[in-house]
Amino acid sequence: MKLKPIEVAEILQKEIANINCLSELEEVGQVITVGDGIAQIYGLANVKSGEVVEFKSGVKGLVLNLENDSVGVVIMGDDNQVQQGDNVKRTKEVLEVPVGKALLGRVVDALGNPIDGKGDIASKEYRHIEMKAPGIIERTSVSEPVQTGIKAIDSLIPIGRGQRELIIGDRQTGKTAIAVDTIINQKQAHSLTNESDKIYCIYVAIGQKRSSVAQIVKKLEDAGAMDYTLIVSATASEAAALQFIAPYSACSMGEYFRDNGMHALIIYDDLSKHAVAYRQISLLLRRPPGREAYPGDVFYLHSRLLERAAKMSEEKGSGSLTALPIIETQAGDVSAYIPTNVISITDGQIFLESELFYKGVRPAVNVGISVSRVGSAAQIKAMKQVAGSVKLELAQFRELESFSQFGSDLDPATKAQIDHGKRLVEILKQAQYNPFPVEEQIVSIYVGTKKYLNDVPLQKVKEFEDKMLTEIRLNKKDILESIKNEQCITEETEQKLKAFLENFVKEFVK
C-alpha cells in the first residue's frame, strides 16, 4: 500500500510531536586540582558562595572560596572519588537537611542521612542549614527552667529554656556525662501528656570516636531516652567539611521544634574540634591565618551558630531552643582563643576541674568560676528558697579550707564552718546516669543547708541521703507532691519536712 505524501507528512508531524526532547542548560566546570578534601574548580563563573555543586561521581561539594579564575570547594564525602579533569555542575541550591519528629530516635550524618541501619526517614520538610538568628522583637526573656537532674547545676548554675550555657573543662572531667544526664532527665517530662513540659533533645558529635558515639546511643537506648532524642554524628574519620557543617544541620533540626511552639535542647560536643575542622578547611583554602592559626572569622563561626538558640515570644509560638556547647581546654587554660570566644558568646559557663574530679568530687563543678547569667530568672521558687546561701557558704568553705592548711589551731566556729562545708560538698556529689527529680534535689539541699548533717559522720552522708530519700518516697510522698505542685516550700510543708528530718536524723545517728 502506497502512502500519499500528505499522509507521510502528517505521520512525521505526529511522531515529532510525541518526541520528548527537552534540552536542559547546565553550567559545568572542571576540577583543576584536588586533595585533602578540597577541590579547585575552573569554569563556574556564576556560582555563589555557599552553593552545592555536584561532581561526576555523584559526590557533593560546598563552595566556600570565590577567586578571580577559580572556585574553592570543600568535598562533602570521599575525595578519592574526585579526579583532576572531572566535570562539576552547579545545582543552584544551598544545603538543606530533613527536619521534623520523624528524626527522633535516629542517628544521622551531617547531611541528615540515616546511619543507624533502621531504614529511610519519612520526613516531608526540609530546611536550610544556615538560617538567620531570630531578631530582638521575636524573642522574649528566659523564664522557664531546663532541669538537668544534677543537684550542683540546678541549684547553683540554673539553666533556662532559650539559654546558651557553656560546659568547659579538660578532657575526661565529665563534660559529656553532664550533657547525657540532662537528656536522660527529660524522660520524666515526656511521660506526661502536656506538650509544653516536654523538651526534645539533639546531640551533635563533632570529631568524636565512633566507639564513644555508639556508647552514648546505647546508654540513651537503655535509659529509654532515644524516643525523644536525635543524634547527629560527624566522627573523626569523616571529612572535615562534614564536621564543619554538622552543628548547623543539627541546629536547623532543633529550630523546627522552636518555631512550632515546642522546646528543644541541643548539645554541641564539642566546639573545639569544630573550630579545628574549620581551621583545617581555611588553611587548605589558603585563607590568611590569625591567632593560633585560626582564620579571622572563627568568632563569627560560633556566634552565628549559638545566636540561633532563643526563647521565642508569644506571637511566635513561645517555643525555645536551648544550647549546651562543650569546649575542651588544655591544662585548665580558659584564656585560650576558642574558650574565651565561646565564653563571651554564651550566657554563662559550667567549669569542670580535673583536680576536683580526681579528688572524687563528681560532677567536678568549680562553683567559684561557674556562672549562669540568665538562668536564675528561670529557677523555681522552692529551689531559690533552699539554695540561696549555698554558693556563698561553699566559697567561704574553700577560702577557709585553703587557709586551714597552714595551721591546725582553729577556733570552734571556723572548725564548724569547715565541717559544714565538707558536708555540703558531699551532698552535692552525684553518680553518673542518676539524675534526680527537682523536688528530691530540693529536699537534699535543704538537709545540707539547714545543718541536719552536722551529727552525721562525713563518710556516711551519701548513705544518709539515699536512705532519707527512700523513706520520704515511701512514707512522706505528700511532701514531695506539695513541692512539685506548689513550686515553693509552704510553711505547712516545711513543718512536715522538719518533723520528718528531726526523727530521721535521730534514728540514723543511733
From Swiss-Prot:
Q: Which reactions appear under catalytic activity for this entry?
A: ATP + H2O + 4 H(+)(in) = ADP + phosphate + 5 H(+)(out)
Cited InterPro entries = ATP_synth_asu-like_sf, ATP_synth_asu_C, ATP_synth_asu_C_sf, ATP_synth_F1_a_nt-bd_dom, ATP_synth_F1_asu, ATPase_a/bsu_AS, ATPase_F1/V1/A1_a/bsu_N, ATPase_F1/V1/A1_a/bsu_N_sf
Q: Which domain of life is it from?
A: Bacteria
Keywords, comma-separated and alphabetical: ATP synthesis, ATP-binding, Cell inner membrane, Cell membrane, CF(1), Hydrogen ion transport, Ion transport, Membrane, Nucleotide-binding, Translocase, Transport
Q: Which residues does ATP bind?
A: 169-176
User: Gene Ontology terms, cellular component aspect?
Assistant: plasma membrane; proton-transporting ATP synthase complex
Q: Where is the site Required for activity?
A: 370
- Please give the Gene Ontology molecular function terms for this protein: ADP binding; ATP binding; proton-transporting ATP synthase activity, rotational mechanism
Keyword Ion transport in annotation: yes
Give any Pfam family that matches: ATP-synt_ab
EC numbers for this chain: 7.1.2.2
Report the membrane topology from the UniProt record.
Answer: Peripheral membrane protein
Any idea where this protein resides?
A: Cell inner membrane
EC class name: translocase
Assembly and interaction partners: F-type ATPases have 2 components, CF(1) - the catalytic core - and CF(0) - the membrane proton channel. CF(1) has five subunits: alpha(3), beta(3), gamma(1), delta(1), epsilon(1). CF(0) has three main subunits: a(1), b(2) and c(9-12). The alpha and beta chains form an alternating ring which encloses part of the gamma chain. CF(1) is attached to CF(0) by a central stalk formed by the gamma and epsilon chains, while a peripheral stalk is formed by the delta and b chains.
The record ties this protein, via HAMAP family, to: ATP_synth_alpha_bact
Tell me the function of this protein.
Produces ATP from ADP in the presence of a proton gradient across the membrane. The alpha chain is a regulatory subunit.
The family note in this entry says: Belongs to the ATPase alpha/beta chains family.
**Know the name of this protein?**
ATP synthase subunit alpha
User: What species was this sequence derived from?
Assistant: Rickettsia rickettsii (strain Sheila Smith)
